[in-house]
Regions:
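Bacterial N-terminal signal peptides that target proteins for export
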Residues: 1-8
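Sec/Tat signal peptide C-region and signal peptidase I cleavage site
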Residues: 17-21
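Accessory terminal helices/loops
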Residues: 22-34, 223-225, 237-314
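Metallo-beta-lactamase
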Residues: 31, 41, 46, 78-80, 86-88, 137-255, ...
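Conserved beta-strand hairpin/beta-sheet module of binuclear metal-dependent hydrolase folds
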Residues: 46-97, 182-186, 190-194
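Divalent metal-coordination and catalytic microenvironments
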Residues: 50, 73, 83, 98, ...
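Active-site HxH/HxHxD metal-binding segment of metal-dependent hydrolases
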Residues: 92, 96-162
Length: 314
């Protein structure tokens, strides 16, 4: 009895610590506002059996951090990873975490976003698993052709990868954040990874994006029968929240495009992201405090102006 009392007392002492360490579920991409520390990362979230989201921190606005998120699919025939991290050290941590889940090799890495914060560490995949296959869109394949890990397979529309007993759909739904964004969908588990097509609670990074096409691509992904939907930045919450937040991200992108059109029609100049009078008078309304607004707004306005003027790449 005395021993049981001591155990209970110890648990009661630990309880406040557990409460203090608990994540605060506020809708923000800022880990600090969620009550999280750098030491809380990287972290793995199981979405469905053998399907995971992996969150790691990277520098964001000055003095701040944001997550870069990957998808991990473990099958009886090996592992598929969608997106990597921004440097070899961070990707080595990702590989180590995967090795703790399964002794099976990583067979495929799908490059959903060609940008360095998702591909800069891809050499770590190759070092750990020399036979790994990198898959990308034709646009991203060309962009990464001179890299140390050039994609050898391209998806122009849709490809089904049969890995073990699992079917994995790699989808090219159109241009969005880049010219070659991909999504990965598991029809069996109903999990959809949208990479940088969906940045949870971040101001849209449009400097190399395609404003109206991005909205169209989001809508195509929203039409997919998915329980889980998550993206390449921000946090992964419960399924209902993630769907609601995808709609919120689409609404934000719509508002950014509308504000850019208003300023363009008013004759306010935005010659480049570094020379943009429009950003100083823009009204972002409820999106004023979304993460990275200060750094991303000039490029977003520039890109909306280019779309209006027919100057976007074909």
């Amino acid at each position: 009895m005395r021993s049981a009392t001591k155990i209970l007392a110890a648990l009661l002492l630990l309880a406040p610590l557990a409460v203090r360490a608990q994540e605060v579920r506020v809708q923000t991409a800022d880990p600090v506002l969620r009550g999280l520390k750098q030491s809380d990362f990287p972290r793995l979230k199981q979405l469905e059996p053998n399907v995971y989201a992996y969150e790691e921190l990277r520098p964001s606005d000055p003095g701040k951090f944001k997550t870069t998120v990957d998808m991990i699919v473990v099958t009886s025939g090996g592992v598929l990873v969608a997106d990597g991290q921004g440097n070899p050290g961070a990707t080595e941590k990702l590989v180590a975490r995967i090795k703790s889940l399964t002794p099976l090799p990583i067979k495929y890495v799908v490059v959903c976003s060609e940008h360095e914060d998702h591909t800069g560490g891809n050499v770590a995949f190759k070092a750990a698993f020399p036979d790994v296959v990198f898959v990308a869109s034709p646009v991203s394949q060309k962009a990464l052709a001179a890299s140390a890990t050039p994609p050898t397979e391209a998806v122009a529309d849709k490809r089904i990868i049969h890995l073990g007993a699992t079917d994995i759909e790699v989808l090219n739904q159109g241009r969005a954040h880049t010219g070659g964004d991909l999504s990965v969908y598991l029809p069996g588990a109903k999990v959809l990874f949208m990479s940088e097509i969906y940045d949870h609670r971040l101001f849209p990074s449009l400097a190399r994006g395609f404003p109206s096409e991005w909205l169209s691509t989001i809508k195509k992904n929203q039409a997919i029968d998915a329980k889980w939907v998550f993206g390449g930045h921000g946090f992964v919450d419960d399924p209902a929240t993630m769907k609601h937040e995808l709609a919120a991200f689409a609404a934000e992108l719509t508002a950014v495009i509308a504000e850019g059109r208003r300023l363009h029609d008013a004759g306010v100049a935005c010659r480049s992201a570094k020379d943009c009078d429009a950003v100083r008078v823009a009204n972002w309304g409820p999106y004023e405090n979304w993460s990275e607004r200060v750094t991303q707004a000039p490029g977003a306005l520039m890109r909306v102006y280019q779309e209006i003027e027919g100057k976007l790449p074909k």
